Amino acid sequence: MESQQLHQNPHSLHGSAYASVTSKEVPSNQDPLAVSASNLPEFDRDSTKVNSQEETTPGTSAVPENHHHVSPQPASVPPPQNGQYQQHGMMTPNKAMASNWAHYQQPSMMTCSHYQTSPAYYQPDPHYPLPQYIPPLSTSSPDPIDSQDQHSEVPQAKTKVRNNVLPPHTLTSEENFSTWVKFYIRFLKNSNLGDIIPNDQGEIKRQMTYEEHAYIYNTFQAFAPFHLLPTWVKQILEINYSDILTVLCKSVSKMQTNNQELKDWIALANLEYNGSTSADTFEITVSTIIQRLKENNINVSDRLACQLILKGLSGDFKYLRNQYRTKTNMKLSQLFAEIQLIYDENKIMNLNKPSQYKQHSEYKNVSRTSPNTTNTKVTTRNYHRTNSSKPRAAKAHNIATSSKFSRVNNDHINESTVSSQYLSDDNELSLRPATERI
């Protein structure tokens, strides 16, 4: 009895997976599955009865044996029109379906899937609204006229997927997902779907259509086996089995994080300091880089940080290399303190330096002109030194000496009220000042 039912309905295990696949949606002259899909039996809404066309149904070899796998596995697919694909890391032509990627736009392909954990199946209606769990990044789809004027190269609301697009390679391990998703995003861009892919800021230019959503959903799981996906991707798909957009958004965000990590490592390895900026600013810059790496689960030890900093020191700070060369227990805080100490000492020394006077040439003439008079008077000072003239320093010494002796003589003259004053020398002479005359 059971074998008879299987003979009568060989596709009952697949439900209505191919019910809506008709020749209207997929051109018969391009799609390799058009012949088999157009002759498939039509099922009613309950998927329990089969009409009289059951006798013309092709063999079961074109249907995958595992009904939890969504990607079609036809028995034989002709090679793509643009020749064989490169086999390096790419799917074989019979799996790629590259002769017409529009096959993956069929919404009915989304009804059977091992990603599926929700009973809310998609209806095979091209005008079915987008699911509400997809974050609406734009309020409404752009007007085709305005969009064509502003972005002529951007696909419109209903994008025709390009044929003969090089497929991404199949995901082989969980560790390679971050690399694989880059190729998958490039594949979507080559398929005229670049404006619905999140950019570096997580923004998209327009909302995807229902067919585009089905296309992304089907191609994603066709090239990314569920058991090879990372844990965070599985958690998203277990909640909403077709929310591929959220997966792409978080993947782009993780790419940006990885790029920032690379930039931080490059900045840390190329540190340079010569005292041109304050030591506090240098310390804040280095500490910020180390803290950002720590937030991404990358710990930079004090010894490694000190070695990278010492490598970039120059000028008066260069001698710290020899001081820390023999140290085994390096502390980053101690190194920052010594850099701050040297910076403060140099700052104080620069403030205490005497001002440099501008030196004039010995043969330079300084002229002063009086603009208010009719006859211009020019005063010329010639600093040409003669042979008989004394140096300027000697003249200054003589002036200071003469002023000293004149100050002493004035003191002796003013002391007239003193009765006598004795000056002792080797001969013990006694001198009396002249008496005042009344």
Curated annotation (Swiss-Prot):
Q: Name one GO biological process term.
A: viral translational frameshifting
Listed Polar residues bias regions = 1-11, 19-39, 49-60
Q: Where is this region: Disordered?
A: 1-88, 364-397, 418-438
Tagged with keyword Metal-binding: no
| Record GO terms (molecular function) | RNA binding
**Which chain positions carry the site (Cleavage)?**
397-398
Q: Where is this region: RNA-binding?
A: 295-397
Say which domain of life the source belongs to: Eukaryota
Recorded GO cellular component terms are: cytoplasm
Q: Where is the composition biased (Low complexity)?
A: 369-381
This protein's major location comes to cytoplasm
Q: Which InterPro entries match?
A: TYA (IPR015820)
Where in or outside the cell? Cytoplasm
* Alphabetical UniProt keywords: Cytoplasm, RNA-binding, Transposable element
Q: Per its database record, what is this protein's job?
A: Capsid protein (CA) is the structural component of the virus-like particle (VLP), forming the shell that encapsulates the retrotransposons dimeric RNA genome. The particles are assembled from trimer-clustered units and there are holes in the capsid shells that allow for the diffusion of macromolecules. CA also has nucleocapsid-like chaperone activity, promoting primer tRNA(i)-Met annealing to the multipartite primer-binding site (PBS), dimerization of Ty2 RNA and initiation of reverse transcription.
Q: What is known of its domains?
A: The C-terminal RNA-binding region of CA is sufficient for all its nucleocapsid-like chaperone activities.
Q: How does it assemble?
A: Homotrimer.
Question: What else does the entry mention about this protein?
Answer: Retrotransposons are mobile genetic entities that are able to replicate via an RNA intermediate and a reverse transcription step. In contrast to retroviruses, retrotransposons are non-infectious, lack an envelope and remain intracellular. Ty2 retrotransposons belong to the copia elements (pseudoviridae).
Q: This chain belongs to which protein, by name?
A: Transposon Ty2-LR2 Gag polyprotein
Originating species: Saccharomyces cerevisiae (strain ATCC 204508 / S288c)
